[in-house]
Design a protein with these regions (language model features):
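Acidic/aromatic-lined carbohydrate-recognition and catalytic surfaces
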Residues: 1-177, 181, 194-244
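Hydrophobic residues within beta-strands of alpha/beta enzymes
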Residues: 39, 187-189
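Conserved protein kinase catalytic-loop anchor
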Residues: 184
């Protein structure tokens, strides 16, 4: 039996109005009595929280609102004592615009880190294509001081990561394995179907009065996501027999 916990509203133990890891630890016995085997945590990574923590600015850090890495390690240890498993949300289609990678990309739009994302030149003063983000408005946001745009299928503060770049994939795999080495049992993978893009970024027939077309149309028509997922599995989850 798996149970999802939204840490922000679960249990606040320090009186700041925000639920925390200490609150989850304190309720493990109760959760065990309910028959829960797996606890799935919504995002607890460092984040500006533009999108409830699904905009991650540091994959290796716990948001201070929720506690510390030491408390997270304690949660893993206490759960293990009770034969319970901890899994977390894994958000790797995109990151936060405050992430170090994206900040470096903005500083040098023609450099190495720009290829961690999708930077494209506009078309005749317009965005590279007429894709609409899942949150509304264009999927493309101007890169300040350039004639380029960056792709975001969700909020503009959530630039999409370029899964065609093997160096980017390697960095993500390293991060995933780091958490699994800690003793995390696995991940619930967020928005993963979106990682494969049509690199030509064609226009689609508009489906609304804004002249844009839902970005899901590109996702539906492009092939290759299965190969990317197999590569992800091979280099991470498979080695640890992780839940996904």
């Amino acid at each position: 039996v798996a149970y999802q916990i939204y840490p922000k509203s679960f249990l606040d133990t320090n009186g700041d109005g925000i639920g925390d890891l200490r609150g989850i630890i304190s309720k493990l016995d109760y959760l065990k009595k309910l028959g829960i085997d797996i606890i799935w945590l919504s995002p607890i990574y460092k984040s500006p929280f533009v999108d409830q923590g699904y905009d991650i600015s540091d994959y290796y850090a716990i948001a201070e609102e929720f506690g510390t890495m030491e408390e997270f390690d304690e949660l893993l240890s206490e759960a293990k004592k009770r034969d319970m498993y901890i899994i977390m949300d894994l958000v790797i289609n995109h990151c936060s615009d405050q992430h170090e990678w994206f900040q470096k990309a903005l500083a040098d739009p023609d450099g190495e880190y720009a290829d961690y994302f999708y930077f494209r030149k506009g078309r005749n003063g317009n965005p590279p294509s007429n894709l609409r983000s899942y949150f509304g408005g264009s999927c493309w946001e101007p890169v300040p001081g350039t004639d380029k745009y960056y792709l975001h299928m969700f909020a503009k503060e959530q630039p999409d990561l370029n899964w065609e770049n093997p160096l980017l994939r390697e960095k993500l795999y390293e991060m995933i394995n780091w958490w699994l080495e800690k003793g995390l049992a696995g991940f619930r993978i967020d928005a993963i179907i979106n990682i494969k893009k049509d690199l030509d970024f064609p226009d689609f027939k508009p489906d609304g009065p804004d002249g844009l077309a839902g970005c899901w149309k590109m996702v539906d028509e492009v092939d290759g996501v299965g190969e990317l997922l197999e590569d992800l599995k091979k280099h991470t989850f498979q080695k640890y027999e992780a839940f996904t």
